[in-house]
Amino acid sequence: MSPMAYFQSTVLCRSVTKLCESQTRKHICVFSPRPKLKRSGMEVNMNILILSCGTRNKLVRFFKETFHEKAGKVVVTDCSPWAPALYEADAFYLVPSMKEPGYLEEIERICRKEDIDALLPLFEDELDLLALNRKRFEEQGIRAVVSDAESVALCRDKYRFFKHLEQNGIPAMFTCDSLESFDRARAEGKIDFPVFVKPVRGCGSVGISRVDCRELLEVLCRYSEEELLIQQYADGEEFGADIYVDMISGKAASIFVKKKVRMRAGETEKSVSVKDEALFELIRHTVSTLKLAGPIDMDIFRVDGNYYISEINPRFGGGYPHAWHAGIKFPELIAENLSGQANEEKIGAYEEGLCMMKFSDEVVRRV
């Protein structure tokens, strides 16, 4: 029986009714650039292995479009044959869960077989794993497209990230790490209902609840199996930023900002591109306080005309296809870095008012 798996496809339009064509810090060298490689007489930048590809069909296509032009190939892995993005790649491998013994050894085996030059993690837990094992792969000539391990850990811990923002004078929604600290902060007028309650190390919108009274807040905090944080409810507009931090210069080389119109399952389903120099500068400053590298997804709120940084996911965001179709092509920036070249800064180099609307599509095949 042929399985059917859904993935997200993207439609762009110039308006909701009409479709269209498509400060200072030291530079951080995440890896040492090396000369371009030659295989079979052709010069190429890399073969890339994308880990835990899941439903990121579009992303796999974007990398194929980029690296086929450079005589490269895109190989992917997942632990399930029901991951539709497997069937978009030049080659795919079913692997054990990343938490099982021997996972890294299996990835190394695939890298040797496919002559892989770079690894790209997409899943939260895999960011930690690859960041911590970067040197292991670099010693084999394989580069992990991932941020510094400490910065990955900080961004994944939402309370630590809030404290980092606070210590660096970056506006953020006030956050507490316990019911007791919430009660103290509320008495001091720093926070009040409604609030968001969310897992400290959650992803997407999983486990997030709006809470309007202390009774419910106490129940959630007392009986949750996960460590929770309590954050001031942001009653305003929500924005997402797709950022590329150059892996050679350590600076933000590209920023694309979209206003989120509608969310589904923690990902942006409908959005419109926007530009704001004040927001670009806030993003630059925030990035400069961390050792980030490669594709970054940032969430921002605007309340009463003021911007507040909500969180950073140091990976490709689910809404990245909007940026790609607006001409912000991170795979090309990755390829440039992997060939040993730093990218020039091009902030806001896209059309404003370009809308994205996702819809469901399917892959049907024998597995």
Please state what every model-predicted region is:
Residues 114, 275-367:
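ATP-dependent carboxylate activation and anion-phosphoryl transfer catalytic cores
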Residues 152-235, 247-249, 277:
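Active-site nucleotide/adenylate-binding loops and adjacent lid/helix of ATP-dependent enzymes
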Residues 7-8, 32:
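Short hydrophobic targeting helices and cationic amphipathic motifs
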Residues 209-291, 301-302, 306-308:
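Phosphate-binding site of ATP-dependent enzymes
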